[in-house]
Amino acid sequence: MKVCLDEDISPDVAAILRSMGVNATSVHEAGRQGFSDREQLELASAEGRVLVTRNRNDFILLTQEFFAKGLPHAGVLILPWTIPPDNFRLVARRIAQYVKRAGDSPSEYLFDFV
């Protein structure tokens, strides 16, 4: 499973994930700060990446819309706010554990919590 971290997750987490063997990038690294949630999801899906975000409410609606319209959707993982955003190692560890359990091919329209 390849992941892309949304704007609300530090790009430092992507670097830690890569050091753990996870294929990870971030919106920050790609220079896509300020893009709409829809654009972030479209771009991540075009790259075959599951988008990891803390923005649950907006991405629930977008996932429903993408499914209803049959638009490409590689998946969304929600990182809960109970995990401190400045604890980069803990954030990375939780994402890496999920990726390891999920394997290489997430299901289309995946929507889950890390």
What are these regions (language model features)?
Residues 37, 43-62:
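Acidic, metal-binding active-site segment of PIN/NYN-like and related structure-specific nucleases
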Residues 16-24:
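Short helix-loop-beta junction
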Residues 1-7, 11, 18-19, 32, ...:
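Acidic, PIN/NYN-like endoribonuclease modules and their adjacent C-terminal/linker elements
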Residues 23, 55-57, 87:
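Detector for Asparagine
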Residues 23-35:
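Conserved BB-loop
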